[in-house]
A protein has these predicted regions:
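Catalytic cores and adjacent flexible loops of soluble metabolic enzymes
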Residues: 1-325
Length: 325
């Protein structure tokens, strides 16, 4: 795939998606203050973001409501308390995990909802169920995207088949390249993005990227993908997200050349909310343990536990992670 634009060029097809509440919610069990959420919404509108992901549409039969904040479930009334009828250009989205969302019960018709987009997330082994969910949501009137998770552990043949099935049989408008473990390097991202774009363009779809920062490559991987034609770019304020976090909103807003995007509202939000959140002890961001799991292409759950235990025995951890019996 040829490069699509230069670093200083303007790309009208680019869409910036703020995932702070959803991916960041994995850090603090979605316990955000009303002021935080309302100010985040206002900041995204002012910054020119295209989409704000409010959280998960998780099943209350699968997850105990008392264990999480409201953005784990994203009830319609809770979103409307923040956005009203959302008379802005910012679109509202939620994520629905295959097998963890009672989608036929909890996803109401678009005509009754302020939500614009459902972001379905699946693993390679649940593609048929994902297609069913995608098409159901599309038939209810929503825009739908699909995140294929943990692709760094899938075989080339599995990924090729998954992409073809999703592109040909689902009504998703965007297929996301997801670096779940933060293990991929820019050269790999370029090759994968090329693969995704070729399939997507054949079926009239777009491609997005959701990067993790285990090896401090989330921003680099995002702009690498963007350069060759990926258009939906996921970010979070100060990179807030599970484990090592994600691509920083501040970095991407400083990079993009589209005059509709403004960095000042992002910086003001970071100053008001993200700095105090860090000082209050909410932990995320790249650290040695996350680098180790990313380098080993492993889920960060062990690094998250390492962090929670206050450990600093990095060499022992590295030996544990890389030992094969």
């Amino acid at each position: 795939m040829e490069q699509k634009g230069e670093l200083i060029s303007y790309r009208p097809d680019i869409k910036v998606v703020d995932c702070t509440l959803r991916d960041g919610g994995l850090v603090n069990n979605f316990e955000f203050s009303e002021d935080f959420v309302r100010d985040l919404y206002k900041a995204n509108v002012a910054a020119g973001d295209d989409n704000m992901e409010f959280g998960y549409k998780a099943s209350k039969e699968v997850f105990n409501v008392d264990d999480y904040g409201k953005w784990k479930f994203c009830d319609e009334k809770d979103i409307r308390e923040i956005v009203g009828d959302n008379n802005t250009d910012l679109k509202i989205s939620v994520m629905a995990d295959v097998g963890r969302t009672d989608f036929k019960k909890d996803i109401i018709p678009k005509s009754e909802s302020v939500i614009d987009m459902i972001r379905v997330a699946t693993y390679i082994n649940t593609i048929p169920a994902a297609i069913e969910m995608i098409n159901y949501c599309a038939d209810m009137g929503y825009e739908v995207t699909i995140n294929i998770m943990a692709i760094s552990t899938a075989s080339e043949n599995e990924l090729d088949l998954a992409l073809e099935l999703l592109a040909a049989q689902s009504k998703a408008s965007v297929i996301y390249l997801v670096d779940s473990y933060g293990s991929l390097y820019p050269e790999q991202i370029r090759r994968l993005a090329d693969k995704y774009l070729k399939v997507a363009e054949k079926y009239g779809k777009s491609v997005g990227i959701h990067a993790h920062n285990n090896q401090q490559l989330a921003f680099a991987n995002t702009i690498e993908a963007c350069t060759i034609g990926v258009s939906y770019l996921d970010v979070t304020m100060s990179g807030m997200g599970r484990g090592a976090g994600n691509c920083y909103s501040e970095l991407l807003m400083g990079f993009l050349r589209n005059p509709k995007y403004r960095i000042s509202p992002v910086l003001k939000f970071v100053e008001k909310h993200m700095v105090p959140l860090k000082k209050a002890g909410v932990v995320w961001g790249c650290d040695v343990q996350y680098m180790i799991t990313g380098n080993a292409n492993q889920h960060p759950r062990t690094a998250i536990a390492f962090t929670a235990d206050g450990r600093t025995d990095y060499d022992n951890f590295y030996t544990q992670i890389t030992s094969y019996e």
